[in-house]
Amino acid sequence: MRPLLEKIARGLELSLEEAYNAALAILKMEAGEAETAALLMGLRVRGERAFEVAGFAKALRETCLRIPVNDPYVIDTAGTGGDGLRTMNVSTISALLAAYLGVKVLKHGNRSVSSSSGSADFLEALGFNISVKPETALLMLNNHRFSFAFAPMYHPAMKNVMPVRRRLGIRTIFNLVGPLANPGLVRRQVLGVAEAGIMGVMAEAAGLIGYDHLLLVHGEPGIDEVSVFGRTMIYEVKGNSIDKYVIEPPELGLRIHELRDVVVSNPMESIEKAKRGLMGVDEAALDFIAANTAMALYVAGKVKDPRDGVEAVKQIAGNSNDFWSYVNNVAAVSRRDSA
């Protein structure tokens, strides 16, 4: 580890293999706490590079509890979190909607850190058992098109890093690689990024990892979601190619709203906001949901144009009983399993 620390201190980039070996040493507790803290802080201060993010992601994928997904069209909507703006849990409701509309979704996520409602909190409030075993997760995915992979359960080695991360109290490279380490090794994903400045690095890292189709999104005024409050910056990764562009709500056929209209204080408020949106009585919530679901449908190859995805969601608005029945049924299936 010391040669790597010296390399970082000199401002040099670690190779993918060096980063991978460093991450493995940390995850397997072969590195001391001081070395781990020094490496994480050194990378953050200098700025993480693509090979380093890819190397850490490779190690995290290797040490996870695997869900043996073989379908290349399964998607995820996990993001970095950390925007601190306490918006409704749109990535999870969008994942459920995408599944209802025919896409297989293996949602990877955790409890809230900086938001009012993390994906795990939101799903628990809906009645889901968030700790299903891999065989149940795969069964749910194949039979019901939706399953959840609770990050602490599927990445047990991460508990070895938590004491150092808590003491540091800042964003580290592990915040970046967590969303890139879905236990099903999905090849398609909408990945929200709270920190716009790292999107290019994450896009390059995703190209090294080997995604078929990945959308990195960062929306105004600083959310790790597709925004209906201003512009959304997007890095679109297909294999080794990366395209960068910006979209605005009117391009999706949506209005521009105020962020305060989708802020919630707890998971139950997030559910109520989603229900009101899909009833057609909360336009801001509906448009926020539609924009993010549209990108999930697009990355899955279900629609060729995100505007068609928006239209698919709008058709549910005002007549969402079947959708909520679907959600309740999937939640009931999850409760039959106990880890």
UniProtKB/Swiss-Prot annotation:
Residues at which 5-phospho-alpha-D-ribose 1-diphosphate binds: 79, 82-83, 87, 89-92, 107-115, 119
Keyword S-adenosyl-L-methionine: no
Cofactor note: Binds 2 magnesium ions per monomer.
A GO-annotated cellular component: cytosol
Enzyme Commission number, as recorded: 2.4.2.18
Residues the record lists as binding anthranilate 1: G79, N110
InterPro entries: Anthranilate_Pribosyl_Tfrase (IPR005940), Glycosyl_Trfase_fam3 (IPR000312), Glycosyl_Trfase_fam3_N_dom (IPR017459), Glycosyl_Trfase_fam3_N_dom_sf (IPR036320), Nuc_phospho_transferase (IPR035902)
SUPFAM superfamilies listed in its UniProt record: Nucleoside phosphorylase/phosphoribosyltransferase catalytic domain, Nucleoside phosphorylase/phosphoribosyltransferase N-terminal domain
Source species, domain of life: Archaea
Binding residues for Mg(2+) 2: D224, E225
Sorted UniProt keywords: Amino-acid biosynthesis, Aromatic amino acid biosynthesis, Glycosyltransferase, Magnesium, Metal-binding, Transferase, Tryptophan biosynthesis
Pathway(s) it belongs to: Amino-acid biosynthesis; L-tryptophan biosynthesis; L-tryptophan from chorismate: step 2/5
Binding site for anthranilate 2: R165
GO terms (BP aspect): L-tryptophan biosynthetic process
Single GO term (MF): magnesium ion binding
Residues involved in Mg(2+) 1 binding: S91, E225
Catalytic activity: N-(5-phospho-beta-D-ribosyl)anthranilate + diphosphate = 5-phospho-alpha-D-ribose 1-diphosphate + anthranilate
Cofactor: Mg(2+)
Family annotation (NCBIfam families): trpD (TIGR01245)
Similarity comment: family membership: Belongs to the anthranilate phosphoribosyltransferase family.
Quaternary structure (record): Homodimer.
Job of this protein: Catalyzes the transfer of the phosphoribosyl group of 5-phosphorylribose-1-pyrophosphate (PRPP) to anthranilate to yield N-(5'-phosphoribosyl)-anthranilate (PRA).
Name of this protein: Anthranilate phosphoribosyltransferase
